């Protein structure tokens, strides 16, 4: 028996929801194919495959297989570029979790699936955190709590930009303030509440206002040449809000569907004005991990 699952790219933090908020993107995605075996082996193809470890102890899908006691021959077709800030390792972990649970007939509930996938994330980041794997499994908008996951089946237009630069996760974590003035805390709580309401109502204006934060994004923006120019250009083109995706360097802009193409182009132009090459694409908040038909195409979209 072979099980094939597609799991999407994700954007975590969303400005005001540091380590808490996440959304699934309709594209790109990883596609993971699993088959029972005595020991786990991993092969990887697709975007940035050369940067993805195939040692099961170092690969997120391999760690998931060990956590579930579900050895398998695992093939990962990467659609989510590693080190993009779009949850590349989480996409593989999420797809592997859903696929292996199906392969071994393990009826796990959503929280258990997310917990298992988060263990895989520890192979990539050193921390079993769920802000990317939760939306990769459940889709829509998710809120990660210590005792569970809140989920909203949101659907909003987005533009995503990938500048040709790198941001170390260690550096991105290192610049996050350890303390903050009460005024900044109140402002961030206000934004987080506004964003959550906006997701519940599929309101791009509220979500756009809600991604603004006074704590994490300003600190991380200093690590990204061209971010301020790209953010300003996107807003001029109709974006209701712009923020760094995860620890970067990916950038996500909230917008109305009619403005999405123009916003994507503006993000590229903004980075270009600062001497940074970039590419961008149009997407939306989308579905989570999905099993593909047995004879389906396992190419990563």
Swiss-Prot record:
HAMAP family: Homoser_kinase. Its EC number is 2.7.1.39. Its main location: cytoplasm. Belongs to the GHMP kinase family. Homoserine kinase subfamily. Catalyzes the ATP-dependent phosphorylation of L-homoserine to L-homoserine phosphate. Gene3D superfamilies: 3.30.230.10, GHMP kinase, C-terminal domain. It is found in: Cytoplasm. One of its GO terms (cellular component) is cytoplasm. Keywords: Amino-acid biosynthesis, ATP-binding, Cytoplasm, Kinase, Nucleotide-binding, Threonine biosynthesis, Transferase. SUPFAM superfamilies: GHMP Kinase, C-terminal domain, Ribosomal protein S5 domain 2-like. This is Homoserine kinase. The keyword Ligase does not apply. Pathway: Amino-acid biosynthesis; L-threonine biosynthesis; L-threonine from L-aspartate: step 4/5. The keyword Protein transport does not apply. GO terms for molecular function: ATP binding; homoserine kinase activity. ATP binds at residues 81-91. It comes from Halobacterium salinarum (strain ATCC 700922 / JCM 11081 / NRC-1) (Halobacterium halobium). It catalyses: L-homoserine + ATP = O-phospho-L-homoserine + ADP + H(+). One of its GO terms (biological process) is threonine biosynthetic process. It comes from the Archaea.
